[in-house]
């Protein structure tokens, strides 16, 4: 059975929506033809998505273990075929990483603010620039990934670690002031890793934040309007 990796974000006993929950409110029309093709091929989308999520979890875990110098990520609960595929993808990551000068700062860092929560995959110094990274095992780099990264950047500047003391909070804030760019690093099943980098000061990053902000407003509005159900 594949482990449920959804994390709950709590502030003063109040559950906060996650960044991915908020972005899920946005329609993704590009998924409709894909789902149709998968259905015509007889693929069970529930099983496919569970496998995709499981593979991503293992790869994330192995990258975290690598940067934190753990002995090994425990993937024993996952199917053998998935473990073998994750080894292949992790090998691709190592090849990608070997071509860059990367120093790890934080990994898998759960953050919260008064509006939402989210877990930052990695904050590193990459080729001399402090970079906020999100690892993806998806087939493509989708635009909303940068909305996700803009939310994580907001959390670094205005939020705090969900766990830890004031010293850690101070460290994260100080590093947040030095972040120069965000990057999506795609490690696909087929093909080699691809990275897309956007500077914090760019128009593209501004648009990414506007996209997330609009998604957050829509998420909150949907919660409110759902209360207007017809009386029984």
Tell me the role of every PLM-derived stretch.
Residues 1, 231-232:
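Short, Lys/Arg-enriched, disordered terminal segments
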């Amino acid at each position: 059975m594949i482990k449920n990796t959804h994390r709950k974000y709590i502030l003063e006993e109040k559950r906060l929506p996650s960044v991915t929950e908020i972005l899920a409110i946005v329609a993704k029309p590009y998924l409709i033809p894909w789902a149709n093709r998968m259905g015509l091929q007889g693929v069970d989308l529930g099983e496919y998505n569970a496998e995709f999520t499981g593979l991503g979890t293992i790869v994330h875990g192995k990258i975290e273990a690598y940067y934190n110098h753990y002995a090994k990520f425990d993937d024993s609960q996952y199917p053998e075929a998935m473990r073998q595929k994750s080894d292949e993808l992790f090998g691709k990551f190592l090849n990608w990483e070997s071509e860059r000068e990367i120093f790890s700062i934080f990994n898998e860092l759960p953050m919260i603010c008064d509006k939402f929560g989210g877990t930052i995959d990695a904050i590193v110094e990459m080729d001399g620039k402090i970079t906020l990274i999100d690892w993806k095992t998806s087939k493509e780099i989708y635009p909303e990934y940068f909305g996700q990264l803009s939310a994580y950047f907001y959390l670094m500047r205005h939020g705090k670690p969900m766990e830890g003391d004031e010293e850690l909070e101070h460290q994260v804030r100080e590093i947040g002031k030095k972040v120069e760019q965000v990057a999506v690093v795609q490690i696909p099943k087929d093909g080699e890793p691809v990275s897309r980098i956007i500077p914090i000061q760019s128009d593209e990053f501004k648009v990414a934040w506007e996209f997330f902000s609009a998604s957050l407003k829509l998420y909150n509005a949907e919660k409110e309007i759902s209360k207007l159900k017809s009386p029984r």
